Regions:
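Active-site donor-binding segments of glycosyltransferases and PAPS-dependent sulfotransferases
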Residues: 3-75
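Conserved acidic donor-binding segment of nucleotide-sugar-dependent glycosyltransferases
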Residues: 258, 272-280, 287-294
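Membrane-proximal helix-turn-helix segments that form the acceptor-binding/catalytic region
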Residues: 99-119
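Conserved donor-binding/catalytic core segment of Leloir-type glycosyltransferases
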Residues: 158-174, 180-185, 191
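Aromatic "clamp/platform" in nucleotide-sugar-dependent glycosyltransferases that forms part
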Residues: 235-237
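Nucleotide-activated donor-binding/catalytic signature segment of Leloir-type glycosyltransferases, i.e.
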Residues: 194, 200-223
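A short, well-ordered alpha-helix in the C-terminal region of glycosyltransferases
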Residues: 295-309, 318-321
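Short hydrophobic beta-strand element within catalytic cores of glycosyltransferases
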Residues: 245, 253-257
């Protein structure tokens, strides 16, 4: 069946991995002769921007409309019968309090999730939190995980003399302050991709940490960063999924991540798990990665096998199955 899908995105974002996810899905769909296009809302995600988007944004004509993430409030105005909304995480709620938190929870998650018929979450953890927040049944939210976005390029050898620890992302949930404390005194270089706060920059200088810093990288730069990394850290306090886990595994790096959902499930046994709120736990994990070559080799190999389940063709197939279900339901309603 030939049909068209329109992916709807935010105007700008601090987490480009979300946009990369659905471009990978769209590439797979296009190879099957399914029409895809992307449109962005005209305004940002401030309170005024949200209400202007709700008032003024109208999606182009398409068989399937897919709210691709972090503009989930559009589910309040989009047609229910052929709209899918993907929820990546609810981390924004942890960064707000009082009336602002209440309003964001209602606009982004509660009201649109109750109104729309088709919802997906990128992990079981996000699904669980969404159904608790919105008060909706579990069967309404389909879990479709994120695909691996970069090509697998296994590292030739772990650098014993000058290992690089890669951290992609510096949002508050990424736990960079504790990571900085944890690498202090360890024989490694820290490569951070993302904007650092004044406090983080000062702390890096005070601790005399050897730093590689890139505020932003294009896709080629990200791929090179993973190829160069010996260790990839994602010791976040909270995640919707955790793409750096599988991106590190695909490139033969040893991954260190949090012993929390969904990160430990995404890692599939191919990572060192640490307590993200304990600097010593993170430091011990990095120290073990640097010193225990047998454990390192075994963990990297488990990670290499783990990434196969995130093949982009398989993830696209799951979205295609959902789209076909929506179209069948539409056809059934027309024939009544």
């Amino acid at each position: 069946m030939t049909f068209s899908v329109c992916f709807i995105e935010r105007r700008e974002g601090g987490s480009p991995s979300i946009e990369r996810v659905f471009r990978a899905v769209a590439d797979e769909l296009s190879s099957q002769k399914i029409g895809t296009r992307f449109v962005s809302v005209p305004y940002g995600n401030g309170i005024l921007g949200i209400f202007l988007n709700l008032l003024l944004f109208r999606p182009p004509q398409a068989d399937i409309l897919h709210i691709a993430g972090h503009v989930n409030y559009l589910g309040l105005t989009m047609p229910r019968a052929n709209t899918v909304s993907t929820i990546h995480d609810l981390t924004i709620l942890d960064l707000r309090s009082g009336f602002r938190r209440w309003l964001i929870e209602k606009l982004f998650f509660v009201w649109p999730s109750r109104r729309l018929r088709y919802l997906t979450a990128i992990s079981k953890a996000t699904q669980t939190r969404l159904i608790q927040s919105a008060g909706i049944p579990e069967e309404k939210v389909r879990v479709i995980e994120n695909p691996l976005l970069i090509a697998s390029s296994p590292k030739q050898a772990f650098s014993e003399t000058d290992p690089i620890v890669l951290q992609v992302g510096t949002a508050p949930n990424k736990n960079v302050e504790r990571l900085i404390e944890a690498v202090s005194g360890l024989p490694c270089r820290l490569h951070i991709v993302g904007k650092l706060s004044v406090h983080e920059e000062r702390r890096i200088r005070e601790l005399n940490i050897s730093l590689i810093h890139d505020e932003t990288l294009d896709d080629a730069g990200i791929e090179k960063a993973y190829r160069d990394a010996d260790i990839v850290t994602l010791c976040s306090t909270d995640e919707g999924f955790g793409l750096p886990i599988i991106e590190g595994q695909a490139n033969g790096a040893l991954v260190i991540t949090s012993d929390r959902s969904p990160m430990k499930e995404v890692a599939g046994g191919g990572a060192i798990l640490v307590d993200p709120e304990d600097v010593d736990s993170i430091k011990n994990g990095i120290s073990a990665a640097l010193s225990d070559s047998e454990m390192r080799t075994n963990t990297i190999e488990i990670g290499r096998q783990n990434v196969h389940r995130f093949d982009r063709a398989e993830i696209a197939r799951q979205y295609l199955s959902l789209y076909n279900e929506i179209l069948r339901n539409l056809e059934g309603n027309r024939s009544k």
